[in-house]
Amino acid sequence: MSRSALVGNITAMLEDAGFTVSDRCAIRPKSFDIAARRGDDVLLLKVLANIDAFDGYTGTEMRRLGEYLDATPLVIGLRTRDEELKPGVVYFRHGVPVFSPDTAMDLFIEEVPPLIYAAPGGLYVNIDGDLLSDIRSQEDMSLGKLANELGVSRRTVSKYEDGMSASVEVAAELEEIFDRKLASPVEVLSGAEEVRDDVDEPEAPEADPDDAEIVTVLTRVGFEVHPTMQAPFKAVSEDEKRERKVLTGHSEFNRTAEKRARIMSSVGHVTRTRSVYVVDSTKRDSVDGTALIEREEFERIHDSDELENLIRERAEG
């Protein structure tokens, strides 16, 4: 299956699950393919046949965009170089949760979250430590007896009760011993932070020198500018109170700029974010809801309210 067809299938599945899905980011470079929202859950999704193609640079950008846009970065893929992705298992690449289309369907359509995650050494399950401790006490089973039945140390059982994950085999054995479900789901929509290894966060990228004047204006009127390197927009800008966020683009106005502006509108609709594209000159006010502002006019803006009003007038005009 081509990657384009795979993206189409994932888009259709998300729409069936009640998500609003953006247009595909059909430009390069791109850190994500589509954005999607259902209620308060916002996703930035990268779709790959081979997840080994997902590099650290892209992972870093997706995590940053997730932070800026209050979204969860996810990768949906089919396989690694060596094997197919197992259903019901969450993998990780560069701090981003990864899983198969089957797992995505279980999660988003059936609302059955995955229970297993991959980590160095094998497959693991999150054990509900408090529940395990309560059941063991109710059954009047000592740490030592349970440890003997599992073939582990008393210290290891104590760690399970303190929240340490267990191998799939041990988790299954625990549930068989007590005849109770003890596994906790992997909270994928929260970034699976409870099981994800910490990753180093490189310094944020510098703005493109060509965008220096745009950054200067945004900073002057009270916005913090977060440059991007692999997105259809040049930056995510937010005011000091983090109440207003704006997807920001800049270039001469040509067919590529128009395409980027359309994608920005679509992504902004999903993330509930305004979008503005600064151009050298144009006779148009907007592209599908992305405001167009000429550079000279943009440089005359004095405060954030003026910018917000101008973006709204252009976008709605």
Swiss-Prot record:
GO terms for molecular function: DNA binding; DNA-binding transcription factor activity. InterPro entries: Arc_TR_HTH, Cro/C1-type_HTH, Lambda_DNA-bd_dom_sf. The keyword NAD does not apply. Residues 132-189 form the HTH cro/C1-type domain. SUPFAM superfamilies: lambda repressor-like DNA-binding domains (SSF47413). PROSITE patterns: HTH_CROC1. This is Putative HTH-type transcriptional regulatory protein NP_1320A. It comes from Natronomonas pharaonis (strain ATCC 35678 / DSM 2160 / CIP 103997 / JCM 8858 / NBRC 14720 / NCIMB 2260 / Gabara) (Halobacterium pharaonis).
